[in-house]
């Protein structure tokens, strides 16, 4: 056993010049190896000590691997935990003087009726009531569950011409065209773009205003960010605009980040991995009072940069 442990170490110093491509030792180099030879009783003590220490080395290596994995995952896991606390009403305290989500919801419905009457939005088909089976977690009593389409405009991007990458849409372009990769890389706010439409491209698309929440529904499922400028995007991206100033788009952007895993699972149940508007419009979403939405956003914008600094 002494030789079993010592030979791999000693063989490093063998002459491997004549070995096959340097990957193996030849007979001559092995036979010429110099090996330190202690007395037999000492060999046995050396082997015993090695066999005592090697399991500790293995345990240390396993512990180090777990620690490296923990350090690698910790910033993202911490971010997910903070967002989950936010959307469950655990990040900031509830204040009775800020009213209830039910009161806010009634304001939203009044605003929708006004916009419908003015012809600015179309009347939607009634959505089904949210059932207990649809509720993924508990929320504070002052909050309520709603469907996204009940509290804002939810629509797919538009790119009518095929193929979507037709150069005729982009040559000499000057208007931002956002794609799924831009949303994925944005880290919350889309401040840059890589592609631009020309006038023909814009004409066959739709312009979304700055402040729109962008959600990817194909390729990278469930990535979310807010537009910092007016832009077009294709039908692989959904735009959501809560009825402002009654609601905070920033709150819904952070809230939708928590739904990435849920949306990804939903997308796998389809023939092609994507999410459609019908699925999104049915999702149950927690709604806090507006003042609490703003306090949640302010707290998140304090904490999330700290997670980024840990990376």
Predicted regions and their residues:
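Cys/His-rich finger/ribbon microdomains and the adjacent scaffold used
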Residues: 103-150
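Non-catalytic DNA-recognition/assembly elements of restriction-modification systems
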Residues: 44, 63-66, 72, 80-81, ...
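A short glycine-rich beta-alpha junction/loop motif
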Residues: 1, 10, 19-37, 171, ...
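Amphipathic alpha-helical segments
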Residues: 29-65, 248, 252, 281-310
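Short amphipathic coiled-coil heptad-repeat segments
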Residues: 54-102, 113, 302-311
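Sequence-specific dsDNA recognition surfaces
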Residues: 129-134, 149-168, 181-210, 265
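Short, surface-exposed loop/turn microsegments at beta-strand edges and helix-strand junctions
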Residues: 7-9, 23-26, 166-175, 187-196, ...
């Amino acid at each position: 056993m002494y030789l079993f442990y010592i030979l791999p170490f000693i063989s490093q110093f063998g002459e491997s010049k004549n070995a096959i491509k340097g990957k193996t030792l030849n007979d001559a180099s092995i036979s010429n190896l110099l090996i330190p030879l202690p007395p037999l009783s000492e060999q046995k003590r050396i082997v015993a000590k090695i066999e005592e220490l090697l399991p500790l080395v293995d345990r240390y290596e396993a512990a180090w691997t777990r620690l490296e994995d923990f350090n690698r995952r910790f910033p993202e896991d911490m971010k997910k935990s903070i967002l989950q606390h936010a959307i469950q009403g655990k990040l900031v305290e509830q204040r009775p003087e800020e009213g209830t989500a039910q009161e806010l919801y009634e304001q939203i419905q009044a605003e929708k009726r006004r916009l419908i009457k003015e012809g600015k939005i179309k009347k939607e088909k009634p959505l089904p009531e949210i059932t207990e089976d649809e509720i993924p977690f508990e929320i504070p009593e002052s909050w309520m569950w709603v469907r996204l389409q009940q509290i804002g405009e939810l629509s797919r991007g538009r790119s009518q011409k095929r193929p979507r990458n037709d150069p005729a849409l982009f040559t000499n372009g000057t208007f931002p065209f956002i794609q799924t990769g831009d949303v994925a890389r944005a880290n919350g706010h889309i401040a840059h773009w890589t592609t631009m439409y020309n006038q023909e491209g814009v004409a066959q698309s739709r312009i979304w205003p700055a402040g729109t929440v962008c959600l990817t529904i194909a390729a990278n499922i469930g990535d979310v960010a807010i537009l910092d400028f007016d832009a077009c995007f294709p039908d692989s991206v959904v735009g959501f605009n809560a009825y402002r100033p009654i609601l905070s788009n920033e709150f819904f952007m952070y809230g939708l980040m928590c739904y990435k895993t849920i949306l990804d699972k939903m997308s796998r149940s389809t023939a092609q991995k994507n999410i459609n508007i019908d699925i999104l419009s049915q999702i149950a979403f927690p709604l806090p009072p507006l003042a609490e939405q703003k306090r949640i956003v302010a707290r998140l914008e304090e904490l999330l940069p700290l997670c980024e600094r840990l990376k």
